[in-house]
């Protein structure tokens, strides 16, 4: 019998898939908020690896306060220019010296930011189109938690906070998530006019799904208005076809709905991101740790990206709760929907939450009592192995936005 406080109980109400109205959003990789998330997390991983390499364990740090101030640009068919650069400030705390070993935390952060920007925004020139500044205050060596090679020590929670996860994704959630990933993957490789700043909003009313896509088109690959219209039409057709892989419901796709062709007002950019023209960004203001913004579901407002992966509950419990939810749905029959909530208590071991709460919607004919033991056993096993989240985050196996 586990000594962990695990609760399994039914959800009052209908599963999201069965509700009359559902809203789902995803901010793509090039969106200013997602850029901040991605840079903060890439810096976090780089710092964690550097600490392990130099002193054998992860020291105290956090980089989850990264901010982006938009620049200005003059896009034009065939190619425009950035007039005022984007300004990015990486801020937070980092341990810069430990037991006589100096760690160049700000240099590591700057290098990681450059790598991420070059990989994510190929049309943005580092140092000219975007200026990056790093201000990391000194972290206290006393606050660091051990993450040694054996990975056996269970850290104490750094805060009284909670994480939330759910499974499975609804049809609308899958469409929104996979549409952005596909557009920012093979589709943009084959169609370079499609920039990386892609936002997808899904709305379902009954069996009718509307998908609204905003795509920052890249001016150097668009010769004229006809070329722009063709690029928009291509995105519309691609997303409509993709949606049929995930649903039999009626799907309508709308792309760049603010365009006014008569006035020449279109979503044309020089760099592939709205950050070039007045759209600021911040860590934690976009996707939750499962990659989506889901107002039909419970969500934690914690920023997951950039947080220390050893004992920061805002990161660990959001990722772990999602992992638990997915595992339960995969391994236990008869579950229509599950929500996992994990609550920590500061100073207590992270493998023993103050409460681990599983809320289930079951299939017809399935009672909670029929599957309660199975669900509890999975939650217990996942909590027992909580330190694997730290390892997988540092290795880049888990995404935070």
UniProtKB/Swiss-Prot annotation:
Pathway terms, separated by semicolons: Amino-acid biosynthesis; S-adenosyl-L-methionine biosynthesis; S-adenosyl-L-methionine from L-methionine: step 1/1
Top-level division of the source organism's lineage: Archaea
Binding site for ATP: 137-142
Cofactor(s) demanded: Mg(2+)
Reaction(s) catalysed (UniProt annotation): L-methionine + ATP + H2O = S-adenosyl-L-methionine + phosphate + diphosphate
Polar residues compositional bias, start-end: 287-305
Pfam families per the UniProt record, alphabetical: AdoMet_Synthase
InterPro entries xrefs: AdoMet_synthase_2_family (IPR027790), AdoMet_synthase_3 (IPR042544), S-AdoMet_synthetase_arc (IPR002795)
Family as reported in the entry's similarity comment: Belongs to the AdoMet synthase 2 family.
Name of the protein this chain belongs to: S-adenosylmethionine synthase
Species the sequence originates in: Natronomonas pharaonis (strain ATCC 35678 / DSM 2160 / CIP 103997 / JCM 8858 / NBRC 14720 / NCIMB 2260 / Gabara)
Gene: mat
């Amino acid at each position: 019998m586990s000594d962990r406080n695990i609760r399994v109980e039914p959800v009052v109400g209908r599963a999201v898939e069965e509700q009359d109205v559902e809203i789902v959003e995803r901010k793509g990789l090039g969106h200013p908020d997602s850029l901040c998330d991605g840079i903060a997390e890439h810096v976090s991983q780089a710092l964690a690896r550097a600490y392990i390499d130099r002193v054998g364990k992860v020291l105290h740090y956090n980089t989850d306060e990264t901010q982006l101030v938009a620049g200005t640009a003059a896009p034009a068919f065939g190619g425009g220019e950035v007039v005022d650069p984007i300004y990015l400030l990486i801020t937070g705390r980092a341990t810069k010296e430990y037991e006589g070993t100096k760690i160049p935390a700000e240099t590591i952060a700057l290098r990681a930011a450059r790598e991420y920007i070059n990989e994510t925004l190929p049309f943005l020139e580092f140092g000219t189109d975007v200026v990056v500044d790093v201000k990391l205050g000194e972290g206290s060596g006393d606050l660091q938690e051990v993450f040694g090679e054996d990975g056996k020590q269970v850290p104490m929670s750094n805060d009284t906070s909670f994480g939330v996860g759910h499974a499975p994704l609804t049809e609308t959630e899958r469409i929104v998530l996979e549409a952005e990933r596909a557009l920012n993957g093979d589709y943009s490789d084959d169609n370079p006019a499609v920039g990386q700043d892609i936002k997808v909003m899904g709305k379902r009313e009954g069996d009718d799904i509307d998908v609204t896509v905003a795509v920052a088109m890249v001016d150097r690959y668009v010769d004229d208005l006809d070329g722009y219209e063709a690029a928009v039409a291509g995105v519309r057709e691609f997303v409509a076809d993709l949606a049929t892989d995930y649903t039999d419901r009626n799907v309508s796709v709308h792309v760049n709905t603010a365009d006014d062709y008569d006035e020449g007002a279109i979503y044309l950019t020089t760099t592939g991101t709205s950050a070039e023209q007045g759209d600021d960004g911040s860590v934690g203001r976009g996707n939750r740790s499962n990659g989506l913004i889901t107002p039909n579901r419970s969500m934690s407002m914690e920023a997951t990206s950039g947080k220390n992966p050893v004992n920061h509950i805002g990161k660990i419990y959001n990722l772990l709760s999602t992992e638990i939810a997915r595992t339960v749905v995969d391994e236990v029959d008869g579950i229509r929907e599950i929500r996992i909530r994990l609550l920590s208590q500061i100073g207590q071991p992270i493998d023993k939450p103050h409460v681990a709460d599983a809320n289930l919607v079951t299939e017809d004919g399935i009672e909670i009592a029929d599957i309660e033991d199975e669900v509890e056993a999975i939650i217990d096993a996942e909590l027992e192995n909580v330190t694997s989240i730290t390892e997988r985050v540092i290795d880049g196996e888990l995404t935070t936005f």
